């Protein structure tokens, strides 16, 4: 059971997990864990499933997924009949009015839909994942000199579950450098898996870029792949000015994570998000939702 904080009603909700029985079996049983290490965590498994989700045969999954998880299709830019395969539906764009962007330059917004954790005073040797598991920031980005620039800064971890809108966006005007790709495995990023596999973010396939934002300094913008994520697709044009709310990219099918790192004394995260993070609870947010302010 995954409990998260709902900002709207100021109470806790239970997340309905796609493939929960499969996740529990894989990460809790000896046979499942063996299969995970031998096959599931490897690229070939996610590639095979991604191939299926790109084919017309997968179209039949769409209606069941919508009904099971109560997806609001009135927000979708395209009609259901336009989706030729499951990934067409999964990577759907939303109508602009579905995710309005606050233009106030001092307002920090969420880069996507998902469950958010926030950590201040970043310790480079011990960044906390869900369930209190720690990992090294140095290991995560594999660049010691860059990592040191973010000592005592702020870290945001946005977990996108399969039922979420799966495009991610820029949080400010600015210029984003080229993407750096780091190879890795494809473990699940669901809290069920994070509690069983230490330092998942450091082990999984991931990409990051430096975003030179106009109002929040230089931000490390990282995307982490997961089980069944066929691809991390970057749609932005490097070294070209982007606007707050512009699309940066999207994930194909699977749960995924976006991680942002800010330098010291650049932002102040909203108190409710910080307090829930300290208690170990993620906070549900949507793309464009205010989550903090410029210091």
Swiss-Prot record:
* Reaction(s) the record says it catalyses: a 1,2-diacyl-sn-glycero-3-phospho-L-serine + H(+) = a 1,2-diacyl-sn-glycero-3-phosphoethanolamine + CO2
Q: Which residues carry this modification: Pyruvic acid (Ser)?
A: 256
Query: A Gene Ontology CC term for this entry?
Result: plasma membrane
Biological process terms from the Gene Ontology for this record are:
phosphatidylethanolamine biosynthetic process
The record's section on Pfam families has:
PS_Dcarbxylase
GO molecular function per UniProt: phosphatidylserine decarboxylase activity
Q: Which HAMAP family match?
A: PS_decarb_PSD_B_type2
Q: What is this protein called?
A: Phosphatidylserine decarboxylase proenzyme
Give the originating organism: Clostridium botulinum (strain Langeland / NCTC 10281 / Type F)
UniProt gene name: psd
């Amino acid at each position: 059971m995954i409990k998260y904080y709902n900002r709207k009603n100021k109470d806790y909700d239970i997340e309905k997990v796609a493939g929960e029985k499969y996740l529990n079996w894989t990460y809790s049983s000896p046979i499942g864990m063996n299969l995970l290490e031998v096959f599931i965590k490897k690229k070939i498994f996610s590639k095979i499933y991604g191939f299926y989700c790109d084919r017309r045969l997968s179209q039949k999954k769409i209606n069941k997924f919508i009904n099971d998880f109560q997806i609001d299709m009135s927000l979708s830019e395209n009609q259901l009949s336009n989706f030729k395969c499951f990934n067409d539906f999964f990577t759907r764009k939303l109508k602009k009015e579905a995710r309005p962007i606050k233009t106030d330059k001092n307002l920090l917004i969420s880069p996507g839909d998902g469950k958010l954790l926030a950590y201040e005073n970043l310790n480079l040797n011990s960044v906390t994942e869900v369930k209190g598991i720690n990992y090294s920031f140095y290991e995560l980005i594999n660049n010691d000199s860059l990592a040191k620039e973010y000592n005592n800064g702020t870290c945001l971890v946005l977990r996108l579950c399969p039922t979420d809108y799966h495009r991610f966006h820029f949080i400010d005007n600015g210029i984003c450098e080229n993407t750096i790709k780091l190879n890795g495995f494809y473990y699940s990023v669901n809290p069920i898996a994070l509690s069983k596999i230490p330092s998942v973010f450091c082990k999984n396939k991931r990409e990051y870029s430096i975003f030179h934002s106009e109002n929040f300094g230089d931000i490390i913008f990282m995307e982490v792949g997961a089980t069944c994520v066929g691809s991390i697709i970057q749609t932005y044009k490097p070294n070209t000015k982007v606007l707050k709310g512009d699309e940066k990219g999207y994930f194909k099918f699977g749960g995924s994570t976006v991680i942002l790192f800010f330098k010291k004394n650049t932002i102040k995260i909203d108190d409710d998000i910080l307090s829930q993070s300290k208690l170990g609870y993620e906070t549900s947010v949507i793309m464009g939702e205010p989550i903090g302010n410029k210091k």
